[in-house]
């Protein structure tokens, strides 16, 4: 099916390849399940990300720093002679794909966006780790303002099971309710037409369970991005669930601060807790156990594949020296299974390989919070290193839009 694309790639006819693939997708989206097409999709997204990140002066400065515990600038007497593309790729990508910067691909062929909205589905603990702990908090409004691409956020509850959050997704998709790109409540909601769904962490299984249970929404979903999504569950969630599953948590108001402080000492404040009567700590962690998530994938992968939605997954990878000190134990524990974990998930857990229409786009060099959240408040950074979260999230968000647009999926 993808042989014409392979011939175009061998000739270096990148514009012809992009145009031909767009035509093929228009005829039959299942072409995105072809292994050769998946290779191109990953390569193209990484190229778009690298190109956009080179426009980010902060990202280039971070990419030029010597690797170490303390973020220091490169001394002027030791200039970095690598190209901007090489610096970005080697700092923010992992694995063999860091060599993608070698090939110069054409700029994105992005159509005008008229009827497509990006909907961000947040993860567990959203807004609870600190007052700024929202995925793409600063980047989403900047991208919307710069390019005119609409972005809203579903008000998924930060601490209850996946199925329970379906009503929150309905509120966003059917009524346009939730938050705007800058995390301000939407006061005059308008239901979106076509949507790009971006699920971060637990937000990804929230979205997947919703789509499996409500396939009638598939025609409105042009693509779904799983951003460090806990699709296969989490060993960390397994351990926490085993500890709390028999606790009497009848009063979320009384126990919430105590439980959250175990996850991130001294971070949560009472004023950050919303929708207290809806908290279900046990249900939240149970839905993230490897048993629950793998059972879901075994049962529902055929359903998800039949929806015809292109699924894209992106994972993170870090090392023990690059995580906050209170996440070190979990990172070391996960290293027994996968040295390239993101401090909360293994690579296999962040992928969606049981769904043929799913493509893994990239392994990013950053821990689970770095690739989504802005820097933690200064007082928290004084207590632990590796909370500055320098990953170029704006470039990643732009590349998601550009890939989807170039494939002819947006309207």
Located regions from the model:
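C-terminal catalytic-base region of ester-bond hydrolases, centering on the histidine
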Residues: 2-38, 55, 301-411
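Active-site catalytic motif of lipid deacylating hydrolases and related acyltransferases
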Residues: 108-195
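Glycine-rich His-Gly loop
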Residues: 121-126, 200-201, 229, 316
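Short aromatic-enriched loop/helix-cap "lid" or pocket-rim segments at secondary-structure transitions
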Residues: 131-133, 235-240, 322-327
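Serine-hydrolase catalytic core
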Residues: 262-326
């Amino acid at each position: 099916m993808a042989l014409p694309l392979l011939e175009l790639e061998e000739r270096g006819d990148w514009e012809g390849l992009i145009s031909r693939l767009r035509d093929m997708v228009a005829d039959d989206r299942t072409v995105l399940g072809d292994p050769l097409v998946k290779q191109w999709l990953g390569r193209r997204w990484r190229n778009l990300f690298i190109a956009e990140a080179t426009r980010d002066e902060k990202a280039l400065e971070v990419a030029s720093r010597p690797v170490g515990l303390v973020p220091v600038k490169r001394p002027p007497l030791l200039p970095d002679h690598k190209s901007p593309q090489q610096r970005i790729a080697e700092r923010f990508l992992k694995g063999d794909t860091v060599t993608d910067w070698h090939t110069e691909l054409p700029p994105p062929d992005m159509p005008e966006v008229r009827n497509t909205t990006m909907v961000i589905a947040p993860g567990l603990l959203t807004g609870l780790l600190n007052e700024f702990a929202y995925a793409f908090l600063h980047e989403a409004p900047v991208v919307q303002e710069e390019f005119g691409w609409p972005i809203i956020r579903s008000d998924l509850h930060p601490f209850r099971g996946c199925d329970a959050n379906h009503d929150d997704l309905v509120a966003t998709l059917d009524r346009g309710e939730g938050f705007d790109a800058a995390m301000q409540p939407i006061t005059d909601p308008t239901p979106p037409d076509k949507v790009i769904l971006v699920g971060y962490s637990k937000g990804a299984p929230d979205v997947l369970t919703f789509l499996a249970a409500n396939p009638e929404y598939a025609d409105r979903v042009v693509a779904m991005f799983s951003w460090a999504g806990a699709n296969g569950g989490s060993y960390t969630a397994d351990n926490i669930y085993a500890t709390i599953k028999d606790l009497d948590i009848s009063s979320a108001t009384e126990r919430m601060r105590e439980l959250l402080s175990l996850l991130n000492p001294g971070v949560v404040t009472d004023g950050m807790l919303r929708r207290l009567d809806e908290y279900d700590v046990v249900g939240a962690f149970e839905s993230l156990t490897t048993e629950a998530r793998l059972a879901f994938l075994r049962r529902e992968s055929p359903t998800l594949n039949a929806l015809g939605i292109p699924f894209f997954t992106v994972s993170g990878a870090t090392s023990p020296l690059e995580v906050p000190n209170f996440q070190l134990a979990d990172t070391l524990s996960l290293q027994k299974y996968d040295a390239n974990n993101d401090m909360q998930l293994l690579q296999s857990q962040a992928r969606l390989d049981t769904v043929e229409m799913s493509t893994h786009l990239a392994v990013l060099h950053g821990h689970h919070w770095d690739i989504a959240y802005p820097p933690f408040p200064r007082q928290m950074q004084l207590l632990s290193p590796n909370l500055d979260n320098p990953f170029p999230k704006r470039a990643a968000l732009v590349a998601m839009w550009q890939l989807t647009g170039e494939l002819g999926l947006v309207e």
